[in-house]
Amino acid sequence: MTASYLAELVETWREWDWRAREAWLNRHPQFLADIGDATVHFVHLRSERADAPALLVMHGWPHTFALQLDFADLLPDFHVVVPSFPGFAFSPTYADGPMTEVRLAATMHGLMTDVLGYDSYFTYGEDVSANVNDLIAGSYPDSVRGIVATHSHFPSRAERADLTAPDEVAFFARLDEWGGANGAYGHVQATRPDTLATSLNDSPAGLLAWLVEKLVEWSDTPAGDPRVVESRISRDRLLTEAMIYWTTQSIGTSFRPYYEGADRPDVMSPVQVPASVHIQRHEGDYPESLARRFYQDLRIFERLSEGGHFTVAEVPAVMAERLRAFAREVGAL
């Protein structure tokens, strides 16, 4: 992020036709559902095929459900559900208690089965929903037809201490080095979330800078000019994310996964359901051996030639075709 690019975005935001973007969002049927102690906002795009497979598409941070909709729109052969996690966008946070990954997995599973009535579904998650994705597949194998991952499973820090394979050790050493230089955002969100949120909820420009900086740095674009992010994520989409966070004042509650559990991941058993793993470019050296140990019915493993941290948002057509290929592999299409 640079001051000149931020000024350019702010100026665009001042003149931007939000009503046109709002109309685009509203073309996607949206609902609220009470699931246990949570109220969850979600988009539900039903296929014209009554017997189409169902798909849960979760978002991460710093984005919202809206960034996943270009991907969802390319999947008319699925019933697609795109929820907002509790505390993000139009989903209020849990009334009490921590936002653990196990709790999020139970809420998302309840949405798909108890609320929407799907007997089975595919699941996709990324970033803060990556572990939730794994937990859904591991905890509810009778309901999950398959799991799609672009952020493949990471063993816990305790488990990493026992790794001996050179490529596995080197991968996490590189991540630790990256975190030391680039992970300050996560540390402050995990330790001083309310202080930071007070500032960001008071300044649209500050909020925009905090969000877009991550979208710039984590997308599959060359370093240098931050404007290049718009080749992957258009300016309309960048401003939509900022506008949703601003109007809902949800940046503070979006930090809860960091504050309440990002450094204390829930223990996970290996996943037994069919899995399709697509390694995004920022984790291009992720060892295949890690995926094969955790996803014990790994049908597809590939290293993507394009697409960064926000994979389904950056290369939606690529990932839509990958999903269809996986669904055909397991007999769902």
Positions of PLM-derived features:
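Alpha/beta-hydrolase active-site loop
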Residues: 98-114
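Conserved HGGG/HGGXW glycine-rich cap/lid loop of the alpha/beta-hydrolase fold
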Residues: 48-90, 327, 331
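Short beta-strand segments
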Residues: 58, 82, 123-126, 148-151, ...
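C-terminal subdomain of alpha/beta-hydrolase-fold enzymes, centered on the catalytic histidine
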Residues: 63, 189-333
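Glycine-rich "HGGG/HGxG" loop immediately N-terminal to the catalytic nucleophile
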Residues: 20, 66, 85-99, 134, ...
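Conserved hydrolase catalytic core segment
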Residues: 77, 115-170
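Non-catalytic accessory segments flanking enzyme active sites
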Residues: 1-46, 246-249, 253-264
